[in-house]
Design a protein with these regions (language model features):
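N-terminal periplasmic "start-of-domain" segments of outer-membrane beta-barrel proteins
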Residues: 1-7
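Flexible, glycine-rich terminal cap/loop adjacent to redox cofactors
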Residues: 7-15, 24-124
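Short glycine-/small-residue-rich flexible loop motifs, especially phosphate/cofactor-binding loops
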Residues: 2, 19-21
């Protein structure tokens, strides 16, 4: 399932399989990467760091799960990952998504897309 929580200013979201042991039990060879990127264009007021972890299957590149932590509307980004999971996307397919850009709302490269690119680059 997909979940979001907020404690004071900190927002967290998670979806899918993140635990490597559980992924192996399900027949996957998991690989995870964690990145930290800006929530909006860096020059825009209110920009903050967002940390994204994605887990994928090493053999197929299929996205298995993800988590997000940050203070600037971070948790809602978990819906992008949940949608990709529902579509059984690979991290390469997620990386190519054309997410909206406007400085008040997001950086040119959304943190989820940056994470997908990093995971995709670590696959054989």
């Amino acid at each position: 399932g997909t979940a979001m929580v907020k404690a004071f200013d900190l927002e967290c979201g998670r979806t899918g399989i993140l635990d490597h042991e559980r992924a192996r039990e399900a027949g996957f060879d998991p690989v995870s990467e964690t990145i930290t990127a800006g929530s909006r264009s860096g020059y825009y007021p209110g920009a903050a760091e967002t940390t994204v972890t994605l887990t994928a299957d090493r053999d197929t590149g299929r996205l298995l799960g993800g988590s997000i932590v940050g203070t600037d509307r971070a948790a809602i980004r978990i819906d992008t990952i949940a949608t990709a999971l529902g579509g059984e996307m690979t991290v390469a397919e997620l990386e190519r998504q054309d997410l909206g850009y406007a400085p008040p709302f997001s950086p040119v490269w959304d943190p989820v897309l940056v994470a997908a690119k990093v995971v995709n680059g670590s696959l054989p």
